[in-house]
Amino acid sequence: MSQYSENIIIGAGAAGLFCAAQLAKLGKSVTVFDNGKKIGRKILMSGGGFCNFTNLEVTPAHYLSQNPHFVKSALARYTNWDFISLVAEQGITYHEKELGQLFCDEGAEQIVEMLKSECDKYGAKILLRSEVSQVERIQNDEKVRFVLQVNSTQWQCKNLIVATGGLSMPGLGATPFGYQIAEQFGIPVIPPRASLVPFTYRETDKFLTALSGISLPVTITALCGKSFYNQLLFTHRGISGPAVLQISNYWQPTESVEIDLLPNHNVEEEINQAKQSSPKQMLKTILVRLLPKKLVELWIEQGIVQDEVIANISKVRVKNLVDFIHHWEFTPNGTEGYRTAEVTMGGVDTKVISSKTMESNQVSGLYFIGEVLDVTGWLGGYNFQWAWSSAYACALSISRQ
């Protein structure tokens, strides 16, 4: 025998839970299915366990999509300040870390508990270990538009909301099911790829593994001209850190990125001044004042930099060194992939989704929210804000039916 819920949400992540809470609050019956044992698994892992739940500065310019105007309506309707107010009302204390990033003081569990208590309070049902294996569309029936096979039970609904997320962090249950639903109904999917993700070394750069654990502030620039100033971290696999994760959104395979290792210094000026004041100084002495000692020593060991008395260094060699430090061209072998990626770029094509309601323009009652869509935010709470804003737009639209 079939079970019925007017609204069914697939996925108990940030977007799915928030949409369920809002729908229930607006008086709609809603059931959430998730294939995992726990709700909000990615929320719990995010921000080092403290959940960077939004940012003080949220604009459409912080998002990438094939349809760059798509995010405007939802972000304007439910803003970062709306979510900050909700968090404050619930008594959750938070702090700004850097660049407007807001984190919970006491841990990401607080956000998950808040979403769950909102669902419980208004009667939204959450069913875990519930694998949706099949979705069918019913024609000419306003009440039942979709039939789902969930484990061994058939469920029917009027509205189906796909909040399945992307492919990043497969260890937390990520699957391509949301994309498969879209394709089943003829909705195009922009090819997904790992994003906000570390770069890996090519064979020729493997010597840099000796720097694992060292970080420094850099300016990193993609071929398209986009640049970020933040920390770069050397790892045993490649380069990571906020600067690298941010630029990975703008990097294309086979391209190089340009890295300024001393964006706050004019190396040429500092060497020339040292030539005047202390011409017998060794080059290494100057460089270790500016850069991590281990990095300078590795350059000397590899023959990239020659340690000598600075008075003997020609203008041409100074210029070559300066170019290397301020314009290091790094060509990644690739990225670490979905295993460590924070988000997935690409997804359900927003050109065929209503930016006001998140409903498919082709299939009535079929909605897509959150990361499953072709919307990728910068690092720093922007992807969570997209989850809240897109979920709210969807819930508000359904509540007015």
From Swiss-Prot:
SUPFAM superfamilies: FAD/NAD(P)-binding domain (SSF51905), HI0933 insert domain-like (SSF160996). Its EC number is 1.3.1.-. It is an enzyme of class 1 (oxidoreductase). This is Ribosomal RNA dihydrouridine synthase. It comes from the Bacteria. NCBIfam families: aminoacetone oxidase family FAD-binding enzyme. Keywords: FAD, Flavoprotein, NAD, Oxidoreductase, rRNA processing. It comes from Haemophilus influenzae (strain ATCC 51907 / DSM 11121 / KW20 / Rd). Catalyzes the synthesis of 5,6-dihydrouridine (D) at position 2449 in 23S rRNA. Its cofactor is FAD. It catalyses: a 5,6-dihydrouridine in mRNA + NAD(+) = a uridine in mRNA + NADH + H(+). The keyword NAD applies. Belongs to the BaiN/RdsA family. RdsA subfamily. FAD binds at residues 15, 34-35, 41, 47, 52, 132, 371, 384.
